[in-house]
């Protein structure tokens, strides 16, 4: 299996706990919001998401209940979210987050 397929499978495993989240694919930049970790960031793909929740894979050392920022790859205002679940699958890590201030409008865009 390829690395991309492995990442998608990891996200799919976590999405089983969020059956109402549709599959989606768009690029974001994930940034740690923890003081002293501001330089920790990476680009990734949101694989599942709608309204208040999103699921993506990451190599960042994120933990349960940690605050992060998501920035749409094409720009825009960062959105703060909280890690609510982690899934490890064959060396990969998927993260589910809940947006701190309601829904994330980008997810509603086609």
Description of each model-found segment:
Residues 1-110:
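Structured alpha-helical
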């Amino acid at each position: 299996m390829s690395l991309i397929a492995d990442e998608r499978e990891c996200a799919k495993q976590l999405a089983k706990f969020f059956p109402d989240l549709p599959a989606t694919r768009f690029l974001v930049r994930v940034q740690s919001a923890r003081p002293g970790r501001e330089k920790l960031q990476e680009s990734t793909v949101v694989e599942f998401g709608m309204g208040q929740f999103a699921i993506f894979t990451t190599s960042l050392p994120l933990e349960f209940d940690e605050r992060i920022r998501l920035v749409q790859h094409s720009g825009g205002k960062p959105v703060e979210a909280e890690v609510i679940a982690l899934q490890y699958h064959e060396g990969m890590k998927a993260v589910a987050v809940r947006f701190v201030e309601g829904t994330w409008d980008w997810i509603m865009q086609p």
